Amino acid sequence: MLERILVLGIFLVFLLIFQKKFRSGRTKKSIVLPKEIEVKDSSLPTVLYFWTDNCVQCRTSQKPVLKNLEEEFGGFNLVDVNAIDSDELTSLFNIKTVPSTVVFSNDGSSRFINNGFADKEELLKQLEEAKN
């Protein structure tokens, strides 16, 4: 019985690691920030934040994290994108769920796509890497 619990525990750890890798990762093919997206300062990294009106996690979790990062870190552009109203962008970045975020480097190329909620530490790490 103890062996089964141990095997199940190991399986769950691997499942959590795999899930984290799936949700957040480097983009395989770099996509350039579309020209129609206006940013305040093109020399800074940019985060596209995909949300919808009926997304509770967008309002209660992801948006507060992004606002907090904006206040503390400040060195990036934040662009809100309604996933329903922006079909082209949603398709371009293969957004499957909301909230989702796409992090672009200073040169406008996509670096990370986070499907689902991305916590402050993960986004901060991605923004630091996108600056270089």
Residue ranges and their predicted role:
Residues M1-I31:
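N-terminal targeting signals for export/organelle localization
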Residues F104-N132:
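Non-catalytic, surface beta->alpha helical segment in thiol-disulfide oxidoreductase systems
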Residues T52-P64:
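Conserved redox-active cysteine motifs that mediate thiol-disulfide chemistry
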